[in-house]
C-alpha cells in the first residue's frame, strides 16, 4: 500500500516537472501578423494565393491586389503606377500553366503576365472564342480557378 502511494507521488512529480520544463523551450514557429501597420492597404483579405515564383498574392476587397515576398508589400489597384488594374475590388487569383495570373474583379477578370508584370489578353484560337472571351471579361467575376489540365474556370454573372 505504501509502495503504491510512493510510486503515485513520484509519478505525479515527474509528470509535473517534465511538463513545466517544456515551457522553457523556444517556440518552433515565428508568428507575425500582416496588417495595415505592416503595409497592407486594408485589413480584409478575400483570398490568398502563392504563385510559382513564391510570391504571395492577397486579394483585398477595396484595397486591390497585394504582392508579398515575405518582407515587403507591393500594392496594385486602380490607378497604380506601373500596373493599373481595372478595380480595387479584387476577389481572388489563380495562375495558369503559362505563368499568367488570372484576377477576379467585380468589374470582370483581368490577366497579368507574371514575367513582365503587365496586363495581357490571352490569345484565342478563332473569332468565336475571342468574342465569347470578350463577353466574359465584361461580366462580374467572383472566382477564378485553374485545374490540373490548365483549363481556367470562372464564376461570373
Model-inferred region functions:
Residues 1-157:
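Carboxylate-rich, polar loop motifs that coordinate divalent cations or form catalytic acidic clusters
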Amino acid at each position: 500500500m505504501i509502495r503504491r502511494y510512493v510510486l503515485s507521488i513520484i509519478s505525479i512529480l515527474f509528470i509535473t516537472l517534465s511538463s513545466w520544463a517544456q515551457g522553457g523551450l523556444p517556440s518552433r514557429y515565428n508568428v507575425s501578423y500582416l496588417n495595415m501597420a505592416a503595409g497592407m492597404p486594408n485589413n480584409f483579405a478575400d483570398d490568398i494565393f502563392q504563385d510559382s515564383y513564391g510570391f504571395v498574392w492577397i486579394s483585398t476587397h477595396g484595397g486591390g491586389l497585394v504582392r508579398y515576398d515575405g518582407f515587403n508589400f507591393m500594392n496594385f489597384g486602380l490607378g497604380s503606377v506601373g500596373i493599373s488594374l481595372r478595380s480595387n475590388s479584387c476577389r481572388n487569383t489563380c495562375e495558369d500553366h503559362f505563368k499568367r495570373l488570372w484576377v477576379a474583379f467585380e468589374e470582370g477578370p483581368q490577366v497579368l503576365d507574371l514575367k513582365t508584370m503587365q496586363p495581357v489578353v490571352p490569345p484565342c484560337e478563332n473569332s468565336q472564342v475571342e468574342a465569347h472571351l470578350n463577353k466574359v471579361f465584361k461580366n462580374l467575376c467572383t472566382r477564378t480557378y485553374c485545374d490540373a489540365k490548365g483549363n481556367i474556370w470562372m464564376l461570373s454573372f
